Amino acid sequence: MLCMNRPCFLVIDREFPGSVSTRKLVIETAKFNVLTAYSGKEALDIFTRFPAVSGIVLDGGLDDVSSSDVAREVKRLQPKMPIIVIATPGFTGCPVADYQLESFDPAKLLEILRSLKPEASAAIEKRNEDLSREKY
């Protein structure tokens, strides 16, 4: 039995709790683990409890705390933590983010996430291929 540590990303989405985050679904489909926060405050609480996440996917249009403030606090706590900000209408930018996507592009988001953890991504892909071959 293959033991695999899958990357885990913190997704900060402004959709309300109880709804299903599209970003979360896209990332989980790629076989990554996801923690989800629905506000900047909740995100910082989760990040404090689970600081070993592989990266952060941040909605640029949070309501309670600006995405720039969330990103600055994360970088204060862990300067090397990768942060991907997804722009929303009216978004003015986030200077401390490592990546900024102009809109939600699932393929581009996954490309960035896979580049953050290439070895784990390759292992996941190989495992998926092996499982596909076993089926047939």
Task: Place the predicted regions along the sequence by residue.
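Non-catalytic signal-transmission and effector/linker regions of two-component phosphorelay proteins
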Residues: 1-25, 90-92, 104-136
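A structural signal for short coil/turn segments at secondary-structure junctions
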Residues: 4, 29, 50-51, 78
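Short beta-strand/turn micro-motifs composed of small residues
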Residues: 11-13, 58, 85-87
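A generic structural motif
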Residues: 30-34
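Acidic, metal-coordinating helix/loop segments flanking the phosphotransfer/catalytic sites
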Residues: 38-55
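Structural motif corresponding to alpha-helix initiation and N-cap regions
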Residues: 40, 64-68, 106
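Alpha4 helix (beta4-alpha4-beta5 surface) of REC/receiver domains from two-component response regulators
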Residues: 69, 73-76, 82-111, 121
